[in-house]
Amino acid sequence: MADPGPASFSTRANALLRKNLTYQKRNLWSNIRLIMIPFYLCILLVIIQILFDTQVNNSADNRCGCECIERNRAGKCQRELCGLEHSKPDQAFFCSIPRPPLWPPLLQIPRPESRDVRGLRDDSCRRTGSCPVTILFTGNNRSLGTTVSENLFTSSVSANASEILRTLANNVLGTTVEADFTNYLDPGIASNLSIYNIQPRCILNATFPFSFEQPPLKFEKELRCVQGSNLWTNTSKEVNDKIFKGYKKGNPEGKINEIAAAYDLLNTDRNNFNVHIWYNSTYKDDAGNRLIKLIRVPRSVNLVSNAYLQFLQGPGTRMLFEYVKEMPKPETSLRLDIASLIGPLFFTWVILLLFPVILSSLVYEKQQHLRIIMKMHGLGDGPYWMISYAYFLTISVLYVICLMIFGSAIGLKFFRLNSYSIQFVFYFLYLNLQIALAFLVSSVFSKVKTSTVASYIYVFGSGLLGLFLLNFLIEDSSFPRGWIIVMELYPGFSLYRGLYELAQFAFRGNLRGEDGMKWKDFGDSAMDDVFYIIVVEWFLALIAAYYIDKISSSGRNPLFFLQNPFKKSPSLRRPSLQRQGSKVSVDMEKPDVTHESKKVERLMLESSTSHAIVCDNLKKVYPGRDGNPPKLAVRGLSLAVPSGECFGMLGPNGAGKTSFINMMTGLLKPTSGTALVQGLDICNDMDRVYTSMGVCPQHDLLWETLTGREHLLFYGRLKNLKGADLNQAVEESLKSVNLFHGGVADKPAGKYSGGMKRRLSVAISLIGNPKVVYMDEPSTGLDPASRKNLWTVIKRAKQNTAIILTTHSMEEAEFLCDRLGIFVDGGLQCIGNPKELKGRYGGSYVFTMTTSSEHEQNVEKLIKDVSPNAKKIYHIAGTQKFELPKEEVRISEVFQAVEKAKSNFTVFAWGLADTTLEDVFIKVVRNGQAFNVFS
């Protein structure tokens, strides 16, 4: 098959996308259960809503007031009459009101004990309730302002019972009772407290009784005179200062000095009327899930307008503000949307539940080393990030769309009343932030269980903290708004705040029979701040996640982005000069290793690519920890492997083989030295190296739910195989490792035996004809027949490929490897083909004999007679092994000596063997360890 060349960005992205879709297809029921979570929650909210409506609407306090007009003998009411006249102020809202009452316009004034007394001699007026009502004035023209302020109040208190509203309108009436959220019943009139008549001058405790009737309602009220005090201030800043310091927390003494109202006449003159009005907005009581109360601002506007008209036209001119009136209404019931009341908590949990799913998926690929194995087979960071991000975003968007559709379908006002476009934009922005955070946080965790526990703590903790902490502080008008914004920097709180705002608008809209949040309301809520916070955090989290991923996955310097991208590495095409004296002295004892090193130096100076792998003085030192010295894992390795050669690495555990493979595959950064793979430097061009590389790791890195065929299709696409070539390569690979017949190819890898998984890992490493393949103990766990078959596959694959494999099987090394290198303590002790090594280190026969213990001396005498220079190498329980130099023995003489010995003592077993590769390995390892200890 022709070389397909490196895969493009789109090809690799397509491969990952197909793999992800197949993977999710295998996990279909898990995805369905995930999507059903919002369905279950919405149904739960509907059930709670039904139970709530049934319970609440049966309460007498939540319906129009009634009076019993007929009782039976037992005293039980048989007939009742309901209406506004029988209702308490709280019940009036529920009554049918075809002709709403007319109410005199009242000015909101402070309670007597809270009025401003800073300009008085003392505060004794508070004990008698006679403190004046203070109103502040300012503007550009003090003379005009003084005249206007003098026209503010009247002295008329005459009453005409036939025209009571007009009579009251000619006076400036005030009340200390806050308004309700409707004007069907004015609490200022309905309460038992006095109505105040604000006049320029008052007789102490002067009162005027009057009767106010609006059928079917009738009230006997008392009009109490109170003095109005108009004070001039030079600037609006002084007005703000006086108002703020009159607030209990605005002065160190904690005193209350409330101002009723304030006016800034600005540039008002005879041709221009321009005024700013201050009022106490806390009377709106707009914190929490309740309707905003009305505030008595209209009378303030009318007063200053009348005062200006009288300034222009004289005291006989005025705009009479006769009454305020609500719109007619039918009888209503209490409409409380439970989804809006508890929705912020529930929907915070619903949306955040995606976070553990995304995080677990990312950490799983990290824990199982699937991310790095994909990267080793050519999947770069760009396609991985783009497809993974787009995939998670698609799943998340479908999730919230299902939530919105189902919530709307079952009638939840939270979704129906608020603008769908606002909801979608809010969810979309937050989902992007949540995905970016998952990528960022995934770099912290290495275990799925740990990440899952931590993420669910985050999910439920965020919802509960939002309900009991953030919700409380939002509704606390004294808590600084700036600190609320700071708290919303925590992503869980920004989500909760956005849902809180949507819930508030839906709740009020449901009570009023209006819409919830629309784009025109955007500036009147905290949603603009939430949007800004989410967008900025999304951008920052995405950059931070990508940056940390680059550092952690490639071992780059944290300041890698400051390096000159056009600066060539000094290691390219130049041999390393970091040769230590100890290395030179060792190489003098190993001519084969020295020859390899010189060969590497020559290749580094040439432009030839005949050798697929060239390692130049590659070294890895692990830093010391806990007081231990640094660990030298690889001691300046120089090695050249041409295309078409299989190079085997032998060595005891801890010799440095794995560290070397990890450096070559990009898992570790070399401490010094470098290596070229197809002419590309592993220190600077690892992403390009991956496109021509195959890896069979020591442990099988597979997706348990994907089949063997799907694994090979994925990795084949990463190697730029397409169409018929891809299918042919996959089938050939499956057949070569005996995973094709009997439907095995289409079984999930999780159902494979250990040997089948191993064969699949080898097939993955070889698909697409990579130029370089690293195999770490490829035949581990295979039965003899499968092992022989696998060796044949590897031997056939090496024709156009450079293969480096590690193994503990001498048989495997001898069958597969063209050359062998034996590693001891991080250094290469010898290098050559198996026959050369056996010839070089195996100039002796191995004689073995087993007898009873009392005849051990006889065996030693026998060997000394045959070979005076023989050396005992093994002795245990009557079994002894000797090395016999080939130059001083003949095989026939050994046989004759043994036959003669059998007549003198009993021989249980004996044998004579030529030197094996295992004997060479043991000898080299022992010599190498002894030399390193001596050094």
UniProtKB/Swiss-Prot annotation:
Keywords, sorted A to Z: ATP-binding, Membrane, Nucleotide-binding, Transmembrane, Transmembrane helix, Transport
Subcellular location(s): the record lists: Membrane
User: Residue ranges of the ABC transporter domain?
Assistant: 613-850
Q: Which SUPFAM superfamilies match?
A: P-loop containing nucleoside triphosphate hydrolases (SSF52540)
- Residue spans crossing the bilayer: 34-54, 338-358, 392-412, 424-444, 454-474, 483-503, 528-548
Q: Report residues binding ATP.
A: G651, P652, N653, G654, A655, G656, K657, T658
GO terms of molecular function: ABC-type transporter activity; ATP binding; ATP hydrolysis activity
Query: What protein am I looking at?
Result: ABC transporter A family member 7
What is the gene called?
ABCA7
